[in-house]
Design a protein with these regions (language model features):
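Short glycine-biased active-site loop of nucleotidyltransferases that positions the nucleotide triphosphate
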Residues: 49-54
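Basic, Lys/Arg-enriched alpha-helical interface segments
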Residues: 21
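Short, conserved charged micro-motifs
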Residues: 13-18
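Residues that line or immediately flank small-molecule/substrate-binding pockets and catalytic motifs
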Residues: 42
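An amphipathic, aromatic/His-enriched active-site/gating alpha helix that lines ligand/cofactor pockets
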Residues: 24-36, 55-89
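Active-site-flanking beta-strand signature of metal-NTP-handling nucleotidyl enzymes
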Residues: 2-8
Length: 89
């Protein structure tokens, strides 16, 4: 199993717009062969010193894939290219 933790930092004030596009793409990713887990996570407020905050413009993507080949296919998927085009700016 392949684990991926991707840290995404949006331009200031754009995190929610990026997350909206991300969440719209999640069903297509979940339907991919080899996808075990794929989803966004944002900082929880008020966790105290135990948490190192990423900031208001950042979120984390947690991914699990059956194999490196499945992850490579995911990266090349048409819906990922379309997502990338929507959020590149």
């Amino acid at each position: 199993m392949i684990h991926v933790v991707a840290i995404i930092t949006a331009k200031p004030g754009m995190r929610e717009a990026i997350l909206k596009e991300f969440r719209a793409n999640v069903p297509a990713v979940h339907a991919e062969a080899g996808c075990i887990e794929y989803g966004p996570a944002v900082d929880a407020d008020g966790m105290g010193a135990i948490q190192t905050p990423f900031g208001a413009d950042t979120f984390v993507v947690i991914e699990k894939w059956e194999s490196p080949q499945h992850l490579a296919a995911h990266a090349a998927a048409p819906h990922m290219k379309a997502y990338g085009a929507k959020v590149k700016d």
